[in-house]
Swiss-Prot record:
Protein role: Probable serine/threonine-protein kinase which may act in the sphingolipid-mediated signaling pathway. May act downstream of TORC2 (TOR complex 2) and PDK1 to regulate sphingolipid metabolism.
Domain AGC-kinase C-terminal stretches: 502-573
Name recorded for this polypeptide: Serine/threonine-protein kinase YPK1
Tagged with keyword Zinc: no
Residue stretches of biased makeup (Low complexity): 23-38
Keywords, ordered alphabetically: ATP-binding, Kinase, Nucleotide-binding, Phosphoprotein, Serine/threonine-protein kinase, Transferase
GO BP of this protein: regulation of sphingolipid biosynthetic process
Top EC group: transferase
Catalysed reaction, written as an equation: L-seryl-[protein] + ATP = O-phospho-L-seryl-[protein] + ADP + H(+); L-threonyl-[protein] + ATP = O-phospho-L-threonyl-[protein] + ADP + H(+)
Mutation effect (D386A): Sensitive to fluconazole (cell wall stress inducer)
InterPro entries in UniProt: AGC-kinase_C, Kinase-like_dom_sf, Pkinase_C, Prot_kinase_dom, Protein_kinase_ATP_BS, Ser/Thr_kinase_AS
Domain Protein kinase: 245-500
């Protein structure tokens, strides 16, 4: 299967070019930058409960806030204070003009330009089930910004609504180049922006009434409330097809198909659409892996895993509709920077630990952890993708012998053919952490056979910059005996290691209450600047497939693949 970018191995690129990583030695604060909601129940211990299927459209309108304040001990940034002094009446004048918050065709650019005139007022990141919208203020003041913004989200399961308020510390560099949906390009979110607090709640999808509440802000400055109006419209049994989407950009390609950025025509939400040609996966005996990916994605209920929104099919193709995570692959950032500092490496590996723990709770082994399969969201949190190599129905005592994965990350028990368990994922977590800290996997060699020999026999060595706690953790994760490997008794043993225990509150991390140490440069929900131009410059087309004459028996293998927006959460089709 494929992630969102294919074919380029980092060992052939920037890691060997001598580029240095940018230092960032600040520990993450306990102030949430992310607004990604935890679907369903936000508590890790209850995460084995699959998401409750629901379908329809959720309209969220955020009007304004009141009583917001800066975090204790933080003063108004100088550029913001200067803007307030220079333009004392602009914000209030714009706020009193007729709101154009519901962005539609003719008024889209005017709405966006109005918002950009008052960049110094708090902006909002609104999110539902990993679909994110950045909303600049129309007017008001620092304590009481006015947004008057509405957005419609697709509902495929019960999830939380979250909204986080930030204050820029400087004016965005780029002039807003307007998009057709009213979202401008520019440096909208800065890594130094101040979090003023957030709200999180689960909407009542059993009621058809509009709720209108002032929700108390948590974190940040610790004061104030935000007015949110919510209404839900159940689905009417519509069947999804490729015509339900506007194709925007190609963001990845593979032998089985491609991944495109798309906009759903009715709600205008942005998604990643993965297309898979049936004939290719049938000819390569990959049907089981493909169906496993769909099964896992429909089950997961974790804030660090890309959720499946819908799936549907035609006679020739399968389609997976996923949340579009546009901060780029970890591969992209690691290749550019060479390596990460310990704080950043710890943050990513801790979130991955929670994602793998969640998969293991469903008796699923991931088996393909690597930087290419890890995405960064708007705010800098990770999102694990590409579940084509997952192995299902693996209890703690079960073993499997399938030889699969990426050479640099293969565990010794897999290479030796003795069978392996869930512990194989802890080995790959160790390899990834080592690579983030040093720039290369621990046993890397350009000759694959020599690399396999090193994985099986070479002593584990560390560069001088790797500190003692990290060395201890890596030694435990990279134990060649899976029966002695750290994590053999469960993820909690890894969480308890000083490398994590001294620095990470895993409950806060699960609830997105720890600010990521890095935020990718993302201008808007449709920004694809973090993806390879080799793909994004290609014209997005759902290419015609020659009639493959798949028999009815073969087509029956794909029954149950479709998962869409009918009242029962299923879009059923036979071909």
């Amino acid at each position: 299967m494929m992630s969102w970018k294919f074919g380029k191995k980092f060992k052939e690129g920037g890691f060997l070019s001598g580029k240095h990583h940018s230092s960032n030695n600040n520990s993450p604060s306990d102030t949430s930058r992310s607004t990604t909601p935890t679907p369903g129940n936000p508590h890790p211990e209850d995460a084995v409960k699959p998401p409750v299927p629901r379908s329809g459209m959720l309209k969220i309108r955020v009007t304004a806030a009141k009583g917001l304040s800066l975090p204790q001990g933080v003063s108004v940034p100088a550029p913001v204070q200067e803007a307030l002094t220079t333009h004392p009446t602009l914000a209030s004048r714009i706020a009193t003009s007729p709101p154009t918050a519901i962005v539609k065709a003719a008024g889209a650019n005017r709405d966006s330009l109005q918002r950009r005139q008052v960049w110094w007022l708090p902006y909002l990141v609104l999110e539902f089930d990993k679909n994110e919208v950045l909303v600049d203020a129309l007017g008001g003041d620092l304590a009481s910004p006015v947004w008057m913004y509405s957005a419609t989200f697709d509902v495929s399961r019960i999830s939380e609504i979250s909204a986080t308020v930030y204050l820029r510390t400087r004016e965005p560099h780029a002039e807003g180049r307007e998009k057709s949906n009213g979202e401008g390009e520019g440096e909208d979110m800065g890594n130094s922006d101040l979090c003023l607090g957030s709200i999180r709640f689960t909407p009542n999808l059993d009621s058809l009434r509009v709720t209108d509440d002032w929700v108390t802000v948590q974190g940040g400055g610790g004061s104030g409330s935000i007015n949110v109006q919510v209404s839900f419209k159940p689905a009417s049994g519509q069947i999804l097809t490729i015509d339900s989407f506007e194709l925007l950009k190609v963001i990845g390609k593979g032998s089985f198909g491609k991944v495109m950025q798309v906009r759903k025509r009715d709600t205008l939400r942005i998604y990643a659409l993965k297309t898979i040609r049936k004939a290719h996966i049938v000819s390569r005996s990959e049907v089981t892996h493909t169906l496993a990916e769909r099964t896992v994605l429909a089950q997961v209920n974790c804030p660090f895993i890309v959720p499946l929104k819908f799936s549907f099919q035609s006679k020739e193709k399968l389609y997976l509709v996923l949340a579009f995570i546009n901060g780029g692959e970890l591969f992209h950032h690691l290749q550019r920077e060479g390596k990460f500092n310990e704080t950043r490496s710890r943050f990513y590996s801790a979130q991955l630990l929670l994602a793998l723990e969640h998969l293991h709770s469903f008796n699923v082994i991931y088996r393909d952890l690597k930087p290419e399969n890890i995405l960064l969201d708007y705010a800098g949190n990770i999102a694990l993708c590409d579940f084509g190599l997952c192995k299902l129905n693996m209890s703690n005592s079960d073993t499997t012998n399938t030889f699969c994965g990426t050479p640099e990350y293969l565990a010794p028990e897999l290479l030796s053919g003795h069978g392996y368990t869930k512990c194989v994922d802890w080995w790959t977590l160790g390899v990834l952490l080592y690579e983030m800290l040093t720039g290369l996997p621990p046993f890397y060699d350009e000759n694959t056979n020599e690399m396999y020999r090193k994985i099986l026999t070479e002593p584990l060595r560390f560069p001088d910059g790797v500190r003692s706690e990290a060395r201890s953790l890596l030694t435990g994760l990279l134990n060649r005996d899976p029966r002695q490997r750290l994590g053999v008794n469960g993820a909690q043993d890894i969480k308890n290691h000083p490398f994590f225990a001294k620095h990470i509150n895993f409950t806060k991390l699960w609830n997105k209450q720890i600010q990521p140490p890095f935020k990718p440069a993302v201008a808007s929900a449709i920004d694809t600047s973090n993806f390879d131009e080799e793909f994004t410059n290609e014209v997005p087309l759902d290419s015609v497939v020659d009639d493959s004459h798949l028999s009815q028996t073969v087509q029956q293998q794909f029954e149950g693949f479709s998962w869409s927006v009918s009242p029962l959460g299923e879009s059923v089709g036979r071909y």
